[in-house]
Design a protein with these regions (language model features):
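Structural transition elements
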Residues: 11, 128, 145-179, 196-200
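Aromatic-rich, solvent-exposed beta-strand/loop patch
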Residues: 2-54, 77-96, 101-102, 171, ...
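Short helices/loops that flank or line small-molecule/ion binding pockets
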Residues: 53-63, 77-81, 205-214, 227-239
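Acidic-aromatic pocket-rim loops
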Residues: 90-106, 113, 227-289, 336, ...
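Short helix-initiation/N-cap motifs at beta->coil->alpha
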Residues: 7, 46-57, 69-73, 195, ...
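Long beta-strand-rich cores associated with HINT superfamily self-processing modules
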Residues: 324-349
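Periplasmic-binding protein-like
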Residues: 74, 111-155, 199-203, 308-316
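Extracytoplasmic/peripheral linker and loop segments enriched in polar/acidic and small residues
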Residues: 120-128, 136, 214-228, 257-328, ...
């Protein structure tokens, strides 16, 4: 492709740009794909509007025609507004909790001399404590798909059987904690971003209440995504319990395994703040990069998923959904990667 289509021959040309204010693009007559794509939009004006309320107000007032990041609390209102429509679709992003399961002791816990998260019964107790349907209903306003694994359905290696969302069972969770030696629970700090994922801090707040019901006293520490991600990526990581979201641009499970499950070191496991390490699993993950027999490769992927699911390394919550709001005479569809492909738009309905 790149041999015959030089950089700078895309569907739109840059006209002007004011950083964090406005970017203006116009259709490029020399686009190599002209005639192959509708190209109904001849000029694009991107406005940066950080406030959810201001963004929605701009759409309703006619200042803008389209809003990409529609707040879940405003979807119903926009759907009911005259002259408006909302397109909803699945996003390529799983939301989940991670735990420090590899350190001898949790820095933020009142348990000293051992690590509660190192016991799989404790991890399974936390899995059972989460009421995913309640989060979907009350926090996400229905705009989420409860999950049992941290891979969206369109990723190679996805297993519907493994993705069955665990039912909330506080009593079973309490029993698991007691069996693990924590009948009265324990305390730990949960690190959460407040500006990265849809209602991220609200998800954490709801989960803190759910963990409290089984006796785990979780102190919530929420902050901007930059410092939050630094806690996860530092060496060693500086978090015992954290919220994270993960998209899969390759649409293949190897992308998940190599960043989140592989033993951390060098370029491997760079987002694996769980301290999980399984050398046999590492070898299988590495083999995926060279295996040319697709049947064998997919069998290895399935085997890896069974192992990491059994080990309960992460606590899946849900997959995000996307909502694009626009004037009713526009028809712009959602894409799992949350990209707006304006060249695919043929014009007004």
């Amino acid at each position: 492709f790149a041999v015959r289509n030089a950089n700078g021959t895309g569907p739109y040309q840059l006209v002007s740009r004011e950083q964090d204010v406005k970017t203006v693009l116009k259709a490029f007559d020399g686009y190599w794909g002209k005639g192959k794509y509708p190209l109904g939009i001849t000029e694009l004006v991107y406005l940066t509007i950080k406030s959810d309320a201001t963004r929605v107000a701009a759409l309703l007032s006619g200042e803008v025609d389209f809003v990409q990041d529609t707040p879940v609390q405003d979807i119903q209102r926009l759907e009911a507004a005259p002259g408006m429509r909302v397109a909803v679709g699945p996003e390529n992003r799983a939301i989940f909790f991670g735990m420090n399961i590899g350190s001898p002791e949790l820095a933020s816990s009142d348990v000293k001399g051992k690590n509660p998260f190192a016991d799989k019964r404790v991890r399974n107790a936390l899995v059972a404590a989460i009421d995913r349907e309640a989060i979907k209903r009350a926090v996400m306003r229905g705009q989420a798909v409860p999950a049992g694994m941290i891979a969206p359905p369109f990723v190679n290696g996805y297993d519907k059987a493994l993705d069955t969302p665990p039912k909330a069972d506080p009593e079973a969770a309490k029993k698991l904690l007691a069996e693990a030696g924590y009948p009265n629970g324990f305390s730990v700090t949960l690190n959460c971003p407040n500006d990265r994922y849809i209602n991220d801090e609200a998800i954490c707040q709801a989960s803190v209440s759910m963990f409290a019901k089984i006796g785990i006293n979780v102190k919530l520490s929420a902050g901007p995504k930059g410092p939050h991600f630094n806690l996860i990526q530092k060496e060693p990581p500086e978090t015992d319990f954290f919220l994270l979201g993960w998209g899969v641009p390759t649409y293949d499970s190897h992308y998940i395994f190599s960043f989140l499950h592989q033993t951390r070191g060098g370029k491997d496991g760079t987002w694996n703040a769980t301290r999980y390490s399984n050398k046999d699993l590492d070898a299988k993950i590495v083999s995926l990069t060279s295996e040319t027999d697709l049947a064998k490769r997919n069998a290895t992927i399935a085997d890896i998923w069974k192992t990491v699911q059994s080990d309960a390394i992460y606590i899946p919550i849900h997959n995000q959904t996307l909502a694009f709001a626009m004037k009713a005479d526009l028809d712009i569809i959602t894409h799992p990667d949350n990209q707006v492909f304006m060249k695919m738009f043929g014009g007004k309905k």
